[in-house]
Amino acid sequence: MAPHSLKKNYRCSRSLKQFYGGGPFIVSSDGSFIACACGDVINIVDSTDSSVKSTIEGESDTLTALALSPDDKLLFSAGHSRQIRVWDLETLKCIRSWKGHEGPVMGMACHASGGLLATAGADRKVLVWDVDGGFCTHYFRGHKGVVSSILFHPDSNKNILISGSDDATVRVWDLNAKNTEKKCLAIMEKHFSAVTSIALSEDGLTLFSAGRDKVVNLWDLHDYSCKATVATYEVLEAVTTVSSGTPFASFVASLDQKKSKKKESDSQATYFITVGERGVVRIWKSEGSICLYEQKSSDITVSSDDEESKRGFTAAAMLPSDHGLLCVTADQQFFFYSVVENVEETELVLSKRLVGYNEEIADMKFLGDEEQFLAVATNLEEVRVYDVATMSCSYVLAGHKEVVLSLDTCVSSSGNVLIVTGSKDKTVRLWNATSKSCIGVGTGHNGDILAVAFAKKSFSFFVSGSGDRTLKVWSLDGISEDSEEPINLKTRSVVAAHDKDINSVAVARNDSLVCTGSEDRTASIWRLPDLVHVVTLKGHKRRIFSVEFSTVDQCVMTASGDKTVKIWAISDGSCLKTFEGHTSSVLRASFITDGTQFVSCGADGLLKLWNVNTSECIATYDQHEDKVWALAVGKKTEMIATGGGDAVINLWHDSTASDKEDDFRKEEEAILRGQELENAVLDAEYTKAIRLAFELCRPHKVFELFSGLCRKRDSDEQIVKALQGLEKEEFRLLFEYVREWNTKPKLCHIAQFVLYKTFNILPPTEIVQVKGIGELLEGLIPYSQRHFSRIDRFVRSSFLLDYTLGEMSVIDPETVETEYPKDEKKKEKDVIAAMEQDTDELKQETPSRKRKSQKSKGKSNKKRLIAEAQGSVIAV
């Protein structure tokens, strides 16, 4: 068999991060994206795969309200700081902002024209703003509580605004009224608790208001009277109406026909949907207040009574066209309901689930032979199964009473995908992932079940390790994988394996051995099925977090809190290799590439790729901001998944082959471009050559080209032409190159010349827009000042030399006159005079004793000069 090629690099292909932290959200008009508040940032999330398309950074202000313009080009936000901001979704920049309320803004609505924005505040006020000008156009007061719901009437002829408040009232405001007393058209008082949501019928004639008093009131907007009150017997958080002409409307009409037993549905009927604390979707008919549909059970999984606060929906919205219904849960999940036509009937099903926040990731494993799904155990009582392609939550396995700590997966002989989970409730559960049901429950442990593992060959058992220090083998014989009710699992054998908690278990690929790693800093190997002790692996200085058998060799790998990974011989328990490189505890390690390599992750947030034979760390990846607790490796695809305390799930793909192809392609392209550059230089096409040199990132070649241009007669025109063809990014590179050239005296003249021409071409407004220009100029200024001072000294010295040579009659005065104009000679004399004046001042400041010594030196020099002159005369 041909050996597998070693992997050299992995790339993070997909990430699932927190994109919604509860609070406000808004759906685009076409349903393609959702703007979600996540702390002080706004995430624009693709509704198909939960990927974050863009992020709008806030200003450390917790967001309380969001709204979109009708054309989805502008996003409005407000927070606790009372600042209202308008964002351009194309540039992600704040185009204007203002303050108006005396308290946080709790709700927002944009007019159909896009020119007006209504805000509802905790200060009991309702304000209307001009979007372009940012000034207040209407000011409404009257509510006696926090105003939380607000909407414009869709009919522009009516020009009214509707608001709902915690004072249990709904008010209708006239935007055309000039008299203050006539601004409030109606006060609708039928609720006995806070109004949480308001909605309008499609014809705009009926208003629906839902409240925490467990009723929905229907209001006639002709006379503002209450047409009906619908008792729902649950605290309501949202009410929305069903639009006609959609598959959802057809589904509701068919329900109406079955309920009323009529051949045709009532065309005049209005249908509305309510959601609330029970976590079920209910569809109502306004005429007669009839409940046409109610979910049999909630899709929100809450296993304990203490978690009732997480049950229920907090908001709902009808999506455009055939996208269905969107409901938001209290635990930051988005449920997408759609209509599905079956053979017997049409049903409302949960088609998609986007999880806004996963909490801490404890464990994860790939599902099935094709590894299209990923089972994830978070800091919850449930296991979430994600579609790897879209990273949307396909389904949830709920049944444990406390947090799930560990899991493992396998494919049974019948082809069903099985999942085993261990929890803090001291039980293990066996799940059929195909039917999404629990088929077995195992009890008997007296501590948290920290590790579970399936058999690798026969799939007839699984093992579990617990905080009670025992290792158990559970039998799967006789278990029906299609059972509707879970049965009690039985143990084959049990042993007190360690002196402290068992953190990890692993089964050998031939099902003959099982290895355990413990808090007592040792790992033990046991013979199956009777759990006879084989050998103890001693050598780690801290607790062991992970153990795994090699797929090809008779060895086992352990990862420990002492920052090392060790490989041990099974035969005698000796340590074969020790791998060091992590800066903190190593939490997981797993073999890849048929045991010739392995990956490890740790509390330092790093993922490392190792070669076993060379003990070399090939690559290190930093994509987590907290401990990486979970590591899953695909057996078929060898795709890697990591999850950590930062609630982030990263998917990694082997990019060795693609990187090699990219490097070859880049090298080939660089050769071709390099030849093109040389041809351009030979043809004296300097503009093209400089452009190519920038593209190839060759600063030395750029310098040679500019240096050659400076020696040309038409250098000014050529350099200006070359600089005008550069882009903004290339100008940034040019400034970087000039900064480096400017530090060297031999290159500074060209650097200063290019810099001078660049400043003449680029206006200051464009120079400021160059990325990092401030730092670049800071590096240019000191050396430029130094070069200027040096050249200035040379110029001054040259004038002194000319004067001296002229006085000594070395230079013909007439030549000096012709070479230097009168003004230049005047400058020269001024310089000499200034220097003589400086010399006189220096003499005056010198102590008398030094002046005497200078005079004596002057006399001796004069005598020496006289003697030399006499000697020369005698010689003549």
Curated annotation (Swiss-Prot):
Where is this chain compositionally biased, Basic residues type? Answer: 849-864
Q: Keyword check for Repeat, yes or no.
A: yes
Which InterPro entries is this protein grouped with? G-protein_beta_WD-40_rep, Quinoprotein_ADH-like_sf, Utp13_C, WD40/YVTN_repeat-like_dom_sf, WD40_repeat_CS, WD40_repeat_dom_sf, WD40_rpt
One Pfam assignment = WD40
Tissues and organs where the protein is expressed, per its UniProt entry: Preferentially expressed in dividing cells in a variety of tissues and meristematic regions.
Would the keyword Coiled coil be found if you checked this record's keyword annotation? no
Q: What are the alphabetically sorted keywords of the record?
A: Nucleus, Repeat, WD repeat
The principal localisation class reads nucleus
CC per GO annotation = nucleolus; small-subunit processome
CDD domains named among the record's database cross-references: WD40 (cd00200)
Q: Which residues form a coiled coil?
A: none
Q: Please indicate the residue ranges that the annotation assigns to the motif Nuclear localization signal.
A: 848-855
Basic and acidic residues: compositionally biased ranges: 819-831
The annotated phenotype of a deletion mutant is: Defective embryo arrested at preglobular stage characterized by aberrant cell division planes leading to an abnormal cell patterning; longitudinal division planes of the proembryo are frequently replaced by transverse divisions and less frequently by oblique divisions. Altered embryo patterning genes expression patterns.
Indicate where this protein resides in the cell.
Answer: Nucleus; Nucleus, Nucleolus
UniProt WD repeat ranges: 58-97, 100-139, 142-183, 190-229, 255-294, 308-347, 356-396, 399-441, 444-484, 497-536, 539-580, 581-620, 623-662
Task: Name the job this protein performs.
Answer: Essential protein involved in the regulation of cell division planes during embryogenesis which defines cell patterning, especially longitudinal division planes of the proembryo, probably via the regulation of embryo patterning genes expression patterns.
* Name this protein carries in UniProt: Protein TORMOZ EMBRYO DEFECTIVE
List the gene name: TOZ
